[in-house]
């Protein structure tokens, strides 16, 4: 029987690349996002299904997992939002947007998915170096990622006896559409470094709680 993966934030960028890689690894992938992914993921309808879902809405998330209704071998919490700037310049709306999606949304997804996980399942959190360090002008984003670092670590301990592995991946700058204007774009991490890491963990018997991936250029250094 084909294994099943669920990837959030799959409409473009890293999420789309993760979904595509898992399809190539033989998984049937359910992609959760607010906007429809590119035609690339729909090339083989027997390997991918898009589920429209705003993960910051707990009821939409609950209904999405009920609609899928399948046991999940791999859950990739990838969806997230980033805004750069000093805390004094950030609006209340920005605070809500980042916390609602990056923290609450990820928790909603993980909570809804938990009843469909079983021994041997893997849960991934696409975190950030901002979840490990204090980075100037990223106060809200870093706070959201630090929250996920703690959440993933504790969840991993809680699920260990159930045979479910939890891995938090902390990449530096990634070459995605979000980084189009970065003057050091040619020195960013290739998305393949993240997808290769996921596949490595899936093929390994070892448990990796935290994985750090640094590009040559790191703005926090």
Q: Across the structure, where does each feature detected by a protein language model lie?
A:
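N-terminal Rossmann NAD(P)H-binding glycine-rich loop of SDR-like oxidoreductase domains
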Residues: 11, 19
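Alpha-helical segment proximal to the catalytic Tyr-Lys
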Residues: 115, 157-161
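Substrate-binding pocket helix/loop in short-chain dehydrogenase/reductase
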Residues: 86-87, 94-99
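Conserved NAD(P)H cofactor-binding loop of Rossmann-fold oxidoreductase domains
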Residues: 78-83
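Residue(s) in the substrate-gating loop at a strand-loop-helix junction
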Residues: 128
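C-terminal helical subdomain
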Residues: 168, 183-221
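Active-site helix of classical SDR
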Residues: 110, 144
């Amino acid at each position: 029987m084909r294994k099943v993966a669920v990837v959030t934030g799959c409409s473009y960028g890293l999420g789309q690349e993760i979904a595509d890689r898992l399809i190539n690894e033989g998984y049937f992938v359910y992609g959760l996002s607010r906007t429809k992914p590119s035609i690339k993921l729909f090339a083989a309808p027997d390997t991918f299904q898009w589920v429209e879902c705003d993960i910051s809405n707990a009821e939409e998330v609950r209904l999405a997992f009920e609609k899928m209704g399948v046991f999940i071998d791999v859950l990739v919490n990838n969806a997230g939002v980033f805004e750069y700037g000093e805390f004094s310049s950030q609006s209340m709306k920005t605070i809500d947007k980042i916390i609602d999606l990056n923290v609450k949304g990820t928790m909603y997804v993980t909570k809804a998915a938990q009843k469909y996980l079983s021994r041997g399942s893997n849960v991934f959190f696409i975190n950030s170096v901002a979840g490990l360090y204090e980075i100037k002008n990223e106060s809200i984003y870093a706070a959201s990622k630090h929250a996920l670092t703690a959440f993933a670590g504790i969840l991993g301990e809680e699920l260990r006896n159930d045979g479910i592995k939890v891995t938090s991946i902390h990449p530096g700058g990634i070459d995605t559409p979000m980084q189009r204007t970065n003057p050091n774009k040619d020195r960013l991490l290739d998305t393949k470094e993240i997808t290769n890491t996921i596949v490595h963990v899936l093929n390994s018997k070892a448990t990796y709680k935290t994985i750090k991936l640094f590009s040559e250029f790191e703005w926090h250094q």
